């Protein structure tokens, strides 16, 4: 992989917030993902790259999607502070925060606008969950024409199978898959 063009590349970190990271994940724990993602955030900000921290939140629950489904959406508990970014990334300067109300980070946010205004054509994606927030954002990014790099060891899912499926069958159709060390070497 060639070096990343920092001025045209953004790191997009999905849902590394207290209420999501605390859940059970595989193949990596929330703690492992936070450790890798925080290294990426620090490295990207040190190089002056655009870093976007995305979280899901609700004002009163009425602003969230509620479609009719065959299976129940696994509702996360929402104690006070559930939607706060984890401390490892919450106080890093020069990051841009986006709040979404659904799985993907594009719909209903200004993510595309902010990326285009900065001349960004490549997104490096990480976060939780591989098969929900990261995957949906990746599909939306693909539809918007962005190049994508998925940091496989800086994301995780509810199960090994979900993570493996998305990384094996979906992400290769949308972009390139790398690990944290490979990305850090390309900065």
Swiss-Prot record:
InterPro entries linked: Isochorismatase-like_dom, Isochorismatase-like_hydrls, Isochorismatase-like_sf
EC category name: hydrolase
CDD domains from the UniProt entry: cysteine_hydrolases (cd00431)
Molecular function GO terms recorded: hydrolase activity
Key word Hydrolase present: yes
Enzyme Commission numbers on file: 3.-.-.-
Annotated keywords: Hydrolase, Plasmid
UniProt keyword 4Fe-4S, yes or no: no
Pfam families reported for this sequence: Isochorismatase
Coiled coil: none
Origin superkingdom: Bacteria
Family indicated by similarity: Belongs to the isochorismatase family.
Protein name: Uncharacterized isochorismatase family protein CA_P0030
Organism of this sequence: Clostridium acetobutylicum (strain ATCC 824 / DSM 792 / JCM 1419 / IAM 19013 / LMG 5710 / NBRC 13948 / NRRL B-527 / VKM B-1787 / 2291 / W)
